[in-house]
Amino acid sequence: FKSGIVVCQNAGLAFSSGFGCEITSEIPIRAGTSSSSAISVSWIHFLSRIADVPAGWDQRKIGELAYKTEVEEFNEPGGMMDQYSTAMGHLIYLQSEPDIAIQSLNPNLGPFVLGDSCEPKDTMFILSRCRDARLEIMEKLKVRNPNLYIHSSGDDLDLTDLTENEKSLFMATIKNRNLLKSALIELEKDELNHDIIGNLLTDHHTVLRDILNVSTPKIETMMDAALNAGALGGKING
């Protein structure tokens, strides 16, 4: 909460008096459902309205400041999709480099079932492990592939300097990138194919489980039960 006030002050807001707040939420905590981002976005929005001179920030600006509040202020690992998705609402495609670009999508996805395994996860550890390993891999690859660009690089890269473990992690990154591109193509259609979206979700989960090791036996049991009950696909959140 203090970081949110600091971020808002850096953005030009001033607060000449204090205030008392009570927060209630039904979002599961530490369950991959963006509970912290929901609080950050709501907090920034509240601060923008309660300031001495209220700010008329739009949803994108609130998402940007929520990201700074949660990630940049603490130098934590993590992307910005949770903050922008929560602030913008509905479904978005977010591209974070070379510049931030947000595309609002409005597909007819139908119902989703969100299951809570009630197993707490160490989000920061998972994100840090994956981020640090990827950064090291990218630095190694640039030695033999000076024009490396993760958004378009293909099978022509020289992976000689990578260990087998690093090759697996890099290929997982490429697979996830390709799954995202395939999903975007489908989601932009007037009539999307729900079976394709379901398969893409499951394929993504397979990468997360088998290569990034972020699933658990209980979540796998829940996934199997959902698929056996007729779900078109599914994946772990967070």
Predicted features along the sequence, with ranges:
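C-terminal nucleotide
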Residues: S85, H90-K235
